[in-house]
Amino acid sequence: MKIISAEQVHQNLNFEELIPLLKQSFSRPFSMPQRQVYSLAPEQSENHDAFALLPSWNEEVIGNKAFTYFPDNAKKHDLPGLFSKIMLFKRQTGEPLALVDGTSVTYWRTAAISALASQLLSRKNSQHLMLFGTGNLASYLVKAHLTVRDIKQVTLWGRNAKKVSKLIADFSILYPAVTFKTSVDVNAEVASADIICCATGAKTPLFDGNSVSAGCHIDCLGNHMTDARECDTTTILRARVFVDSLTNTLNEAGELLIPMAEDAFNKDEIVGELADMCKTPSMLRQSSDEITLFKSVGTAISDLVAAHSVVEKLAD
C-alpha cells in the first residue's frame, strides 16, 4: 500500500485534467452513502470540533475519507483546523491501495467542483469573477475558474485587508492578463459580477440578493452549518438552485435550510444534483438572464476520484 503525501498530490493534479475527469465521473455509476459527521463538543457548547467519515465507491475503487475539524486550532495551538486522510481500496478485490493526504485533495477537488459548476451554469462569455474569501482555497478557486472561463477581472473581498492586498499582488504576478482589484462597495461589485464565488466562514449573508444582476451565476461553498449562510433568502428565491448532493446539503446547508424554515423555499424547488447536471445538459442554464446558484458542501466521490487520479499517475 502506498502512502501519498500532500507534496505528491500537488505535483500530480491540475485543473485542465481534473475538471473534465470529475464531470466524467459524475456522469457514470457511483455509490455515496450519507456521510457521518460526529460532533466532539459537549452538549450546549459553542465548540464545533468534529470528526467525519465520507465513504464512496465507483467501478474502479473504494474510498473512505476521514477528517477532523478543530476550528480553534489556529488561535489556540498554531495548527491547521483541518486534518484529513483518504483510504483507497481496489474495487475488484478489496485490497488496500493507498493512503492519500486528504487536506491537499480537498483543496483541489473543492475548487475543481466549483469551476465545473461554473462551466455548466455560468454564461459562456462570463468575464468578471467576484471572490469572497482569502483563505487557503482562494488561489485554487481563481486558477480553476481561469481554466473554464475567459476571466478578465477578479474582485476579491475579505475581512483582512492585508491578506486581500497580498493575494492581489501575488495573483497579478501569476496572471498578468487578468485585472485583480479589492472590493470597495460589495453590493456594487456584486451587481457587475458574472460569477460570484463564496468561500468564507461567514455566519450571515455576504451581500444583498437584490444586488445580483440578471444572468449571474453564484457558487456558495464555504458554509457547512445549518444556522449559517453565505447568501440571503432573496438570492435563493431569485435563482434556479442546484446542489452537489441533495442528502448532504439538506442536512448541512443553512443557505437552503434557513429559507425552508421561513417557509420561503421548498426542497422540491432544487433543480438537481451535480450528477444530474453532468448527465442532462437540458436542465442547465435556460436563458442568458436567469440567475443560477450552486450550493456545495463537498462530496466523497470527488475526493475518491481526485485521490485515485494521483495514485494512477504515480503508478505510471
Curated annotation (Swiss-Prot):
InterPro entries: NAD(P)-bd_dom_sf (IPR036291), ODC_Mu_crystall (IPR003462), ODC_N (IPR023401). GO terms for cellular component: cytoplasm. Gene3D superfamilies: NAD(P)-binding Rossmann-like Domain (3.40.50.720), ornithine cyclodeaminase, domain 1 (3.30.1780.10). Keywords: NAD, NADP, Oxidoreductase. It catalyses: L-proline + NAD(+) = 1-pyrroline-2-carboxylate + NADH + H(+); L-proline + NADP(+) = 1-pyrroline-2-carboxylate + NADPH + H(+). Pfam families: OCD_Mu_crystall (PF02423). Transmembrane segments: none annotated. GO terms for molecular function: oxidoreductase activity. Its EC number is 1.5.1.49. It is an enzyme of class 1 (oxidoreductase). Disulfide bonds: none annotated. Optimum pH is 6.5 for Pyr2C reduction and 10.5 for L-proline oxidation. NCBIfam families: PRK06141.1. Catalyzes the reduction of Delta(1)-pyrroline-2-carboxylate (Pyr2C) to L-proline, using preferentially NADPH over NADH as the electron donor. Together with LhpH, is involved in a metabolic pathway that converts trans-3-hydroxy-L-proline (t3LHyp) to L-proline. To a much lesser extent, can also reduce Delta(1)-piperideine-2-carboxylate (Pip2C) to L-pipecolate in vitro; however, this activity has likely no physiological significance in vivo since C.psychrerythraea probably possesses no ability to metabolize D-lysine via the L-pipecolate pathway. Homodimer. Belongs to the ornithine cyclodeaminase/mu-crystallin family. PANTHER family: KETIMINE REDUCTASE MU-CRYSTALLIN. This is Delta(1)-pyrroline-2-carboxylate reductase.
